[in-house]
Amino acid sequence: MNVKVTADSTCDLSPALLARYDITLAPLTVIKDGTSYADGLTITPQEIFSHVAAGGSLCSTAAVSVGEYQALFSRFAGSCDGLVHITIGSGFSACYQNACLAAAGFPNVRVVDSRNLSTGQGHVVLEACRLRDQAASLDGLCQELEQLTGKVEASFLLNRLDYMVKGGRCSTVAALGANLLNLKPCIEVRDGKMQVVKKYRGPYAKCLANYVKDRLDGRPELRRDRLFITYTPVEPDCLAAVREAVDRYGHFREVFETSAGCTVSCHCVLFIRQ
């Protein structure tokens, strides 16, 4: 089948991967000081970090609108057998709901809820590209992707809780205590929601190495074809610690390093279980 794959910009795939697999993105809206920007097009993560570091308020995001999805689908639906769009998890945004409403007007368009974000969603997007050439039907392809969404593991390790405080997800007192105790919370996406699963203590580079070991070592059920290291601006020693730990415990055929987009400000390792 000739299947076009599109996705929300939250998948955090690199420009090289987007070009390699002919993936087209639907940008979410980033709102900074009352002005709207297109994620990854008219604003970059570095601009957001610089804005907050200078004392600015935390930026917010808005879902892709029904009209924007309709415009995207109309560009490709007439020139392919089918189109599959993979959204950020429905527990994080209204994108899935809006995409489904837009897809109702296109008989050959399907929408898949990744139940994830960042390159956790990106895994599902790349699987859609891998499977599209061998798919017997559009619905069959989507069923395979929906089964996969429960097997993608996405987690990340926070260095500081400043952004969590600004976003109202953590109290100032709790953040102060965590910073004083040098605690680094590990947050995992489970069943389409984020939750703290463990706390590490010590220098960030050391915590990152232990975190990767815990995620990968002694895990025979992991698929070893692809892993993402997804990060925000970081000290070289921290990224080196992650690379070394992934090399030691991962043994993945492909390891992609990607910068987190405007929606995610964290370090992540993301992979798939069998």
Language-model features, listed with the residues they occupy:
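Short, contiguous strand/loop micro-motifs
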Residues: M1, C59-S60, I86, R160, ...
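Class I S-adenosyl-L-methionine
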Residues: T35-G105
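Short beta->alpha junction loops
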Residues: A63, S114-R115
